[in-house]
Amino acid sequence: MANTSRLPTSCVIPTGGISTGSRRPAVVAFGCSTDGSRGSRRSGVGLVLCRSSSTAGAGGGRKMEDYNTAMKNMMRNPYEYHHDLGMNYAVITDNLIVGSQPQKPEDINHLKNEEKVAYILCLQQDKDIEYWGIDFQAIVSRCKDLGIQHIRRPAVDFDPDSLRSQLPKAVSALEWAISQCKGRVYVHCTAGLGRAPAVAITYMYWFNNMDLNTAYDKLTSIRPCGPNKRAIRAATYDLAKNDPWKEPFENLPEHAFEGIADWERKLIQERVRALREA
């Protein structure tokens, strides 16, 4: 059994490939030659594979094996993360992209030049980045060079309580970045299938006049994944209910806060926007 004490945790790509039932999102795979030029090929899904610069090297296979074993033991879901395939992402809306961690500065070049990204919202903790041997300072430096604003709102991976508590601040940062209308926002965690889609779904739920299931289905039909819906419902409850005698969330039915009244949405939006200065 893998030693999970040293592993960061993250949701990952399904072993059986990505499918959306009858709909197949268009895949674009990018390659980068030694002189930095790119080639691309399309196959038919919303997933984009940017293979300019995977950091997988010696021991990378073992790291992925340990990581995926830990993930299956802790989360019992069908997903796996293949770091060796490079950064991957899906365009969710005209201004919102959800994906995996950038691995090299070349990935930042791609996001800027090919996807017109102006903001990157990173949900990883330091240990998540260090585990994969990514030169984080080089990533941040390239963002600065290209005029991309890099924002961090870390949450503990595979921890629904951490996700619940961090969603309001992460969504606040995302809503602010989108409101600036300067370019797309790239939201990522490690694999882009847990924390990052949860933040994107929550943003659509709270700010795009959708119920939770509609927002959840919209994103997962484009990028198949399994973000924690209960954590989103709990974060919604935390913001919408300020009565000190309110019934604990844990006592509510499973469907509670999958939808909200207009006044609750307005209250949530006010509270989330107030976190910009927090």
Regions found by a protein language model. Name each.
Residues 99-100, 129-155:
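Short acidic, glycine/proline-enriched helix-loop-strand junctions
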Residues 119-127:
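Acidic beta-strand-to-loop metal/phosphate-binding motif
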Residues 112-116, 178:
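Non-catalytic positions within long, well-ordered alpha-helices that form the structural scaffold/packing
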Residues 2-17, 21-77, 152, 158, ...:
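PTP/DSP superfamily signal
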Residues 103-113:
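Short, acidic/polar
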